[in-house]
Amino acid sequence: DILKDLGMPPAMNAADVARAWARREPAFLPTRVLCAPLQVLMDLRRLLGVRGPGHLVAKMLNPVLGAPALRLLSHTRPELGNLMTAWAESDATDAMLLPSTEGEPVADPRRQPRIDTWLAGRWRADLSTAAQTGPLAELPLLPSGTGAATTALYVQEVISGMRPVPPPLARQAAMIVAAVSALRMRPDALAPAAA
């Protein structure tokens, strides 16, 4: 909803993604477009009232067949974090693991969350960080609401320079960029994607 309110409709195919990336914009490919049967499995949440294995599978998928991709994984419970850690290591996965809220990775503008990063299944201390603890010295100026339209307006104000980027978000973004840069330096990152 936030991307829609920013004027960025969902991508419906690979060409839409390529056009968004050519404009240096993010692209959102709905799960139903990426893998319709997985969307059916995920939709069982409404019927069952709990997340099922479909949500876990969706987080673990590499959306770029045959190419390296950094997966941003999230967990709400320590045992799920342990499961994802074991998977990242045993499957030689490129992943960044963060705590989650409502199933999505935390991007807290007030404090830095714990971030663990694996490249080719190896934990990277240089691309990981402990959670910020203790009292906050200062709070960033944030909007009073959390709805999609309010968040989209806030994002536009930050991007345009009208508001500063909260330091925890800047650090988190820098860590993602550093992990992707390290991923791109690997020899297998230069290999052509499988057909």
Regions found by a protein language model. Name each.
Residues P10-A11:
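Internal gly/pro-rich beta-alpha loop/helix module
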Residues D1:
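Walker A/P-loop NTP-binding active-site region of P-loop NTPases
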Residues D5-L6, D16, W21-A195:
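Glycine-rich anion-binding loops and their surrounding alpha/beta cores
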